[in-house]
């Protein structure tokens, strides 16, 4: 046996270590490979380029509200294929597929809880559920959120992420634009704050109704916000749109939104704004997540 064969015979091949699926992910913007757990701790914001990735509705609400205070509302409401709609696929099959993929019954999740101890009702869209499209259940859950805010005499916060009205429900989905807007009029009559947070993307019938009706309309950085998409507009007007058209930075320059807030700063910023609007003490940034419950503001101010 030659010397090289003796060396080869003593070499033990090593097994390739298998990496569990989902441990690593890639940034949609800069392409940087990121550790999944680190990204979740950073609220789905890329630590390299500050790109705000899409966030599930439940993760968003859990990152906003105080621990142990969350109570889900309207979870019993489920969509039905009343029209027996079919395009390339049956609507009921699309619903079943979306429900299996996301674990949600529909595209809006509503919870009540506390924010730095202040009672609030919060709603968030699940974009992975049929593009966050608004159907009858989304409208009904949003109205339920408004009714709960009125009952508890507390503010309402909604995080929008939607492609617009759900075409599979035809006019029933379009009716939700008026239904949700009418419900918000009751909030205005009572003098209760409604803050709309626009995330990427907020389009179509959602942007044309409750998403732009906030007492404050706040957007995340670089969120796409509008009615029709930029490609549709370019094809219609036959002109090239300006850079960044329909992005939150473009909209704030034109006065269409009130402010842009980075996601890691969103919780404290919302609490600070609502404390001022509700005449409550400013939140303590060092306070534990469970907070200290503040009693609801009475319906009427005491007479002087």
UniProtKB/Swiss-Prot annotation:
SUPFAM superfamilies: ClpP/crotonase
Top EC class of this enzyme: transferase
One record GO biological process: malonyl-CoA biosynthetic process
Stretches for region Disordered: 285-304
MF terms (GO), sorted A to Z: acetyl-CoA carboxylase activity; ATP binding; carboxyl- or carbamoyltransferase activity; zinc ion binding
Cofactor: Zn(2+)
Protein name, entry field: Acetyl-coenzyme A carboxylase carboxyl transferase subunit beta
Natural source organism: Shigella sonnei (strain Ss046)
Record lineage: Bacteria, Pseudomonadati, Pseudomonadota, Gammaproteobacteria, Enterobacterales
């Amino acid at each position: 046996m030659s010397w090289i064969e003796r060396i080869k015979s003593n070499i033990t091949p090593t097994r390739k270590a298998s990496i569990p699926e989902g441990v690593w992910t890639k940034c949609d913007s800069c392409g940087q490979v990121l550790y999944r757990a680190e990204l979740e701790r950073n609220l789905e914001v890329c630590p390299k380029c500050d790109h705000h990735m899409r966030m599930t509705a439940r993760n968003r609400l859990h990152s906003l509200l105080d621990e142990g205070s969350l109570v889900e509302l309207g979870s019993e409401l489920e969509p039905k294929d009343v029209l027996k709609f079919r395009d390339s696929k049956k609507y009921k099959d699309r619903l079943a597929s979306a429900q299996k993929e996301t674990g949600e019954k529909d595209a809006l999740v509503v919870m009540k809880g506390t924010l730095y101890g202040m009672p609030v009702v919060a709603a968030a869209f699940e974009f992975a559920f049929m593009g966050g499209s608004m159907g009858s259940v989304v409208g009904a859950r949003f109205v339920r959120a408004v009714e709960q805010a009125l009952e508890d005499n507390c503010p309402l916060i909604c995080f929008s992420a939607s492609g617009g009205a759900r075409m599979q429900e035809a006019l029933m989905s379009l009716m939700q634009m008026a239904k949700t807007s009418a419900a918000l009029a009751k909030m205005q009559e009572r003098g209760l704050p409604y803050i709309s947070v626009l995330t990427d993307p907020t389009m179509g019938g959602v942007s044309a109704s409750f998403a732009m009706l906030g007492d404050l309309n706040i957007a995340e950085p670089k969120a796409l916000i509008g009615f029709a998409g930029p490609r549709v507009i370019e094809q219609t007007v036959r002109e090239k749109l300006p850079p960044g058209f329909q992005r939150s930075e473009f909209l704030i320059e034109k006065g269409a939104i009130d402010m842009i807030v980075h996601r890691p700063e969103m919780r404290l910023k919302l609490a600070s704004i609502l404390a001022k609007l509700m005449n409550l003490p400013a939140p303590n940034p060092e306070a534990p997540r469970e907070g200290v419950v503040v009693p609801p503001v009475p319906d009427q101010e005491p007479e002087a």
